[in-house]
Amino acid sequence: MKFIILTCLLAVALAKQRMEQYISSEESMDNSQENFKQNMDVAFFPSQETVENIYIPQMESVEAPMKVSDIISQQQYNQKMMDMSVSAREKTVMTEESKNIQDYMNKMKRYSKITWPQFVKLLHQYQKTMTPWSYYPSTPSQV
């Protein structure tokens, strides 16, 4: 526990030292922020005054002409969606084997909802007791 606290304090102290290097004076603050951005890949948000002084020209709303590749890809997308909706409506006929598998999976879903001790109790009810006489069938022999 002491080691973790010591490590955290050391990390905070090193972080403060790095920040103090970048904020040494008012004149070098802009340069240091640029260097810090380049070195650390961090985004700084501009102050309110800088945001108000920025001129943003109003752009006219002009629709870009659709390229031929965009039109083709849009048609392909529409065709795929239509195929998917048609295939979703088709009913599939299940074979006997797939019905058996689905029934088995539905039965197993019930067991996934119960806890382990309940499962063991339920399983114990269905187990056959094994005795040597029932396991090894033998016929009485005459001597």
UniProtKB/Swiss-Prot annotation:
Q: Which residues form a coiled coil?
A: none
Key words, A-Z: Milk protein, Secreted, Signal
Pfam families linked to this entry? Casein
Q: Does the keyword Signal apply?
A: yes
Main location group: secreted
Keyword Signal (UniProt): yes
Instruction: Write down the InterPro entries for this protein, in alphabetical order.
Output: Alpha-s2_casein, Casein, Casein_CS
**What does the tissue specificity note say?**
Mammary gland specific. Secreted in milk.
User: Which cellular component terms (GO) are annotated to the entry?
Assistant: extracellular region
Subcellular localization: Secreted
Leader sequence residues: 1-15
Describe the family membership recorded for this protein in Swiss-Prot or TrEMBL.
Belongs to the alpha-casein family.
Q: What does this protein do?
A: Important role in the capacity of milk to transport calcium phosphate.
Q: Return the protein name.
A: Alpha-S2-casein-like B
Record organism: Mus musculus
